């Protein structure tokens, strides 16, 4: 049986990048959106603008997560780690689709900065993979913990009547917590404090800019 080469994985990464960044009319998912059967809520123009900003940030975060997983899968050493990264990336596609659909419903669109975040995250993921699978998994765990924390903050910022967005974020939060737990069980090591702070600083830059652009 032929094993995939680095070139094969690189071609797959280019394909994944195009699938992530080129917005389809409707993205194919493996799961139904948590908001699918919920009724629309009457929102003011200001509320729509604010919710759109939050969902644009969440969508950008999922673009980063997708890229991080793809970069790590590109350089991971162990087969089961590569498979775990690919599985997590597939779930992030669902998140992308849910965020995109909600943005369109609100009359908005994803961040124009997504290509920048994607490229940076792929590079970070690939470097983490080169540093070793345990460190790579540590990046996954820490990334997912930070994503979970900002999703929790967004849940507090949303109007209580916006049941659709709340349902989406809660399901995403559950998935991210599961990804972090799975990474730790697979042998992730805790990252140094300075690395965590650097990741947090980059995350803040992404969230503050993607909210508006």
Swiss-Prot record:
Residues binding Fe cation 2, per UniProt: 92, 144, 176, 179
Top class in the EC scheme: oxidoreductase
GO biological process, one term: ubiquinone biosynthetic process
EC number: 1.14.99.60
Places the protein is found: Cell membrane
Disulphide connectivity of cysteines: none
GO cellular component, one term: plasma membrane
Cofactor: binding comment: Binds 2 iron ions per subunit.
Principal place of residence: membrane
Membrane topology type: Peripheral membrane protein
Cofactor: Fe cation
Keyword Cell membrane included in the entry's annotation: yes
Domain of life: Bacteria
Gene Ontology terms for molecular function: 3-demethoxyubiquinol 3-hydroxylase activity; metal ion binding
Keywords: Cell membrane, Iron, Membrane, Metal-binding, Monooxygenase, Oxidoreductase, Ubiquinone biosynthesis
Signal peptide: none
Pathway connected to this protein: Cofactor biosynthesis; ubiquinone biosynthesis
Chain sites annotated for binding Fe cation 1: 62, 92, 95, 176
InterPro entries: COQ7_proteobact, Ferritin-like, Ferritin-like_SF, Ubq_synth_Coq7
Presence of keyword Oxidoreductase: yes
Family: Belongs to the COQ7 family.
Summary of the function given for this chain in its UniProt record: Catalyzes the hydroxylation of 2-nonaprenyl-3-methyl-6-methoxy-1,4-benzoquinol during ubiquinone biosynthesis.
UniProt protein name: 3-demethoxyubiquinol 3-hydroxylase
Organism per entry: Legionella pneumophila (strain Corby)
